[in-house]
Each structure stands twice: as structure tokens, then as C-alpha cells.
Amino acid sequence: MKKAVILLSGGMDSAVVTAIAQSQGFMVHALSIRYGQRHTSELDAAVRIARALNVVAHKVVDVDLRSIGGSALTDDIEIPDAGGEGIPVTYVPARNTIMLSLALGWAEVIGAADIFCGVNAVDYSGYPDCRPQFITAFETLANLATKVGVEGTQLHVHAPLQFLSKAEIVHEGLLHGVDFGLTVSCYRADVDGRACGRCDACKLRVAGFADAGVVDPTRYMELPCSLLLL
């Protein structure tokens, strides 16, 4: 069987991508990054998801992006309830570039030619490293900057959710048996994994489940207004 490295954050998108890679016959090696994010609930979720999906291997790597700063997800900056104009303060400088680079390194070591990530260009918050152009550019880099690429192995970076709406991602996950109750999407999740119900990530998740006509299994500290209207 072919091997693949999947970036598994613990959120719903990366959980769905992990299940998709498995359905395509890949031996899944899941990679999670402890980068200095303000809460560890998402990483705890990644461990639960990896166990539930019975991946071949799950590695958690430490990278201290908090020492660089520049994001509300790593710094002591208030996380807004609503997104503003331009790139939001929850953007983490170079995060996806660094994470994909680590995935690329592990892929080289284990002999995997495929990397999967859950970036999305439809229901996303304006992050530049979620755009299709970024994924295409990184795949080019991967084949230029690695020993295996130079020696002739074609490396592929897959973003199967890139052009799906959040509702479509929900349906895709259910089709592949993903337990969304294990996942954490919230920027402000507490130690028990309960979501705030107010941040941009929560709003996207709530809207996705509502549009899909599926009950959201998330435990919310504060019930989102859209759910109160149902």
C-alpha cells in the first residue's frame, strides 16, 4: 500500500481529509503540530481522531511559533467575534508553509510521495495560505527541494476539500464515517474541548452543519445565535 502524510490538526476538515486518504487506500501517517497555540484542545482532538480512524502512525511535533508571534492564536491578542476587512488577526504567519514543510520532511523519511491537508478556499477566513495558488506552489517547491524529487519521484500535495463548502465537507465526512463529535474547531475552546460559539471558526462550523441539515455535535459554552433561532 502507498504511504501518505496527513496534517491532522484535530479540526473537522483535517479529520475528513484523514478519512478520505484512508478510503483511497493510503497507509495514513498523521502529523499534528504543537506550535504554541493558546489551547491544546484541538491537539487532544487530533489524538482521539487518530485513534478512532486507526491510522498507521501519529506524530506530534513541537514548533515554537509563539516566540515569533504575530497572531491572535499564539499571542495575548483578543480574538474577535466577527471577521473584519483583510487578513484576520487569527492568521498565523507562515504556519501552513511550516506545517507542510514538516510533513514533507517526514514523507521523505518514510518513503511517502503524497501529502494531504485540509485547507479550504471556499468557506475560509481570508488566509493567504489556504489559496489554491499556495498549494500548487508548495507542490512545485516539494519536487524541487527534496532528494526524492530530484531523483525522479513525483511528490503530490492533495487538498481534497479545497473547493467544497462547509456543508459539503460535513456530508463528505459522514460518507466516510467521521465522528464530528471528536473534533474541535473553536479558536477559544476550553480545556474540556467546549467551543465558545462566537468566534469565526465556530460560526463557519455552525453554518456548515445547518446548511447540511445535520445536527452539530459540538459542545458550546455559549449557544450560537443561529442555533437559538432554530
From Swiss-Prot:
Gene Ontology molecular functions: ATP binding; ligase activity, forming carbon-nitrogen bonds; zinc ion binding
Pathway(s) per entry: Purine metabolism; 7-cyano-7-deazaguanine biosynthesis
Binding site for ATP: 8-18
Catalytic activity: 7-carboxy-7-deazaguanine + NH4(+) + ATP = 7-cyano-7-deazaguanine + ADP + phosphate + H2O + H(+)
Named cofactor requirement(s): Zn(2+)
Single GO BP term: queuosine biosynthetic process
Family: Belongs to the QueC family.
Function field: Catalyzes the ATP-dependent conversion of 7-carboxy-7-deazaguanine (CDG) to 7-cyano-7-deazaguanine (preQ(0)).
Entry protein name: 7-cyano-7-deazaguanine synthase
Recorded name of the encoding gene: queC
